[in-house]
Amino acid sequence: MAALLMPRRNKGMRTRLGCLSHKSDSCSDFTAILPDKPNRALKRLSTEEATRWADSFDVLLSHKYGVAAFRAFLKTEFSEENLEFWLACEEFKKTRSTAKLVSKAHRIFEEFVDVQAPREVNIDFQTREATRKNLQEPSLTCFDQAQGKVHSLMEKDSYPRFLRSKMYLDLLSQSQRRLS
């Protein structure tokens, strides 16, 4: 009944959200939950590239399609805030303007680090407070400790699940079929 009430233009969103309503391993075509542009790009993904993502977490993070695939996986687990925080920190480190540095630092803290932040990442009290203290004089390294903790958490927890997921295994299978 609800599907009848939704306008036709939202069909793509229903497909993406439908995938999210299942457990992450039950969603065989994760490209359905990616935006159109990465979806087209993933069709050009080579088996070699996708296989290299299993070499290390940093290899995955250095590949834009790897990040897109990992983000799609994390969305199915409702834990994409960790990756979004890590990416925001990487972008923050490229900031050259002092005025922008201060405003971006506060925005990232309020979005991801502060207690009850809208997309709060799971870090310990000491790291949160050290990061809060770093905001008194923001620098390009003020989030390094928190970013490192989040990186370790994803590397030890989410990344191994991603590599075992039906989503990733299907991606490898799809890229191998394109070679045949």
Swiss-Prot record:
It is a peripheral membrane protein. InterPro entries: RGS, RGS_RGS8, RGS_sf, RGS_subdom1/3, RGS_subdomain_2. CDD domains: RGS_RGS8 (cd08711). The modification Phosphoserine is found at S26. It is found in: Cell membrane; Membrane; Perikaryon; Cell projection, Dendrite. Residues 56-171 form the RGS domain. GO terms for cellular component: cytoplasmic side of plasma membrane; dendrite; neuronal cell body membrane; nucleus; perikaryon; plasma membrane; synapse. Keywords: Cell membrane, Cell projection, GTPase activation, Membrane, Nucleus, Phosphoprotein, Signal transduction inhibitor. It comes from the Eukaryota. GO terms for biological process: G protein-coupled acetylcholine receptor signaling pathway; G protein-coupled receptor signaling pathway; negative regulation of signal transduction; positive regulation of GTPase activity; regulation of dopamine receptor signaling pathway. The keyword Transferase does not apply. PROSITE patterns: RGS (PS50132). One of its GO terms (molecular function) is GTPase activity. SUPFAM superfamilies: Regulator of G-protein signaling, RGS. The keyword Membrane applies. Interacts with GNAO1. Interacts with GNAI3. Regulates G protein-coupled receptor signaling cascades, including signaling via muscarinic acetylcholine receptor CHRM2 and dopamine receptor DRD2. Inhibits signal transduction by increasing the GTPase activity of G protein alpha subunits, thereby driving them into their inactive GDP-bound form. Modulates the activity of potassium channels that are activated in response to DRD2 and CHRM2 signaling. This is Regulator of G-protein signaling 8. It comes from Homo sapiens.
